[in-house]
Design a protein with these regions (language model features):
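Acidic, polar ligand-binding/catalytic clefts
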Residues: 77-138, 149-150, 206-207
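Extracytoplasmic small-molecule ligand-binding "clamshell" domains
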Residues: 24-101, 108, 146
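Ligand-binding clefts/hinges and TM-proximal coupling segments of bilobed small-molecule sensing domains
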Residues: 73, 151-164, 235-251
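Bilobed "Venus flytrap"/periplasmic-binding protein-like clamshell domains
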Residues: 38, 52-68, 126-159, 165-167, ...
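A ligand-binding cleft/hinge motif common to bilobed small-molecule-binding domains
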Residues: 90, 100-109, 182-210
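Extended ligand-binding regions for polar small-molecule ligands
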Residues: 57-69, 216-250
Length: 251
């Protein structure tokens, strides 16, 4: 009995030491998570699960080059839904998630690398819609579709607009066309791209109500040195024109 107890304690100590080393080592593997959010990140086969070379997009290409320059190894997985991968990156050391809008409420929850790209917040309506908006408050009387767990949906909810949320933002394109919602609160260019992928075109922008910057968000336990190396790599990529070159390939 005593021998078993000593062996168990020894094994626990080894795990603790190895775990601490994995968090503190500058060159430790980082586990990166992302979602289908075209044209920034997307599975090549259009599915809601993909890994490594089967993922593409503006942010994916930028992140790959950034990690290569920083000399930090990583694995990349695209999963669904957003709320799940957000929670994993928030709670698990050595994890990160992209792309995420950097908002005041999130500032102290993660360590940030970016910006990777812009994400304007817009209200889309059907081509034949008579809706006219001058400010966000004007949308209160309409049924607004949004993406569950997204910064846009969170912001609308905080302002009392009560968005109708879905697990896949592209579903809002079809709901808008079918008259199930009056407006679609989404990002630009992501929303239009998603709509085209679902065969929906001709939507019109009736309000542009915010402009956010998208980042790589890393768990708070990721070493500061690693964050600094990644940020320096991204800054140099921007100076070299690499970020603009990547953007031009998709837009």
């Amino acid at each position: 009995m005593l021998r078993r107890l000593l062996l168990a304690l020894a094994s626990a100590c080894v795990l603790l030491v190895n775990g601490a080393h994995a968090v503190e080592s500058l060159d430790a593997d980082l586990v990166l998570l992302t979602e289908n959010f075209p044209p920034y990140n997307m599975a090549k086969n259009g599915k809601n699960f993909a890994q490594d070379e089967n993922i593409e997009g503006i942010a994916v290409d930028i992140v790959r080059e950034m990690f290569k320059r920083a000399g930090i190894t990583y694995s990349l997985t695209l999963r669904f839904p957003w709320e799940r991968i957000y929670k994993i990156a928030l709670e698990k050391p050595g994890y990160g998630v992209f792309v995420m809008a950097r908002l005041p409420d999130r500032e102290k929850l993660f360590k940030w690398v970016g910006p990777i790209g812009p994400d304007d917040w817009i209200m889309l309506a059907r081509a034949d819609s008579k809706i006219s908006l001058e400010k966000l408050n004007d949308a209160r009387k309409y049924k607004i579709g949004a993406y569950k767990g997204d910064a846009i949906a969170e912001t609308l909810a905080k302002q009392g607009l009560k968005p109708v949320v879905v697990l896949r933002d592209q579903d809002n394109a079809r709901k808008l066309v079918n008259g199930q919602i009056d407006l679609w609160a989404t990002g630009d260019p992501a929303g239009r791209y998603l709509a085209r992928q679902d065969g929906v075109t001709g939507l019109k922008t009736v309000l542009r109500f915010n402009s956010a910057e998208l980042y790589l968000a890393l768990n708070r336990n990721v070493p500061d040195d690693a964050v600094a190396k990644l940020q320096a790599a991204l800054d140099q990529m921007r100076k070299d024109g690499v970020v603009d070159e990547i953007m031009a390939r998709y837009l």
